[in-house]
Swiss-Prot record:
Has the structural arrangement of an alpha-helix connected to a beta-sheet by disulfide bonds (CSalpha/beta). Its main location: secreted. It comes from Tityus discrepans (Venezuelan scorpion). Keywords: Disulfide bond, Ion channel impairing toxin, Neurotoxin, Potassium channel impairing toxin, Secreted, Signal, Toxin, Voltage-gated potassium channel impairing toxin. The keyword Mitochondrion does not apply. GO terms for molecular function: potassium channel regulator activity; toxin activity. This is Potassium channel toxin alpha-KTx 18.3.
Length: 62
């Protein structure tokens, strides 16, 4: 049971990361208040530091 919880969290992180990766690369997507903690986590999943997070856009440093 503990393992399934860990697996669920990992799968969720991958799905969230892929959504943010698409938003970061395409520069479009749902416009909403950018959440710095989610943006930073998405950039960390890509192996990059967060550059900025404003106007619903998450940008990672290259």
């Amino acid at each position: 049971m503990h393992f399934s919880g860990v697996a669920f969290i990992l799968i969720s992180m991958v799905l969230i990361g892929s959504i943010f990766e698409t938003t970061v690369e395409a520069g479009e997507g749902p416009k909403s208040d950018c959440k710095p903690d989610l943006c930073e986590a998405a950039c960390k999943d890509l192996g990059k530091p967060m550059d900025f997070c404003k106007d619903g856009t998450c940008k990672c440093k290259d």
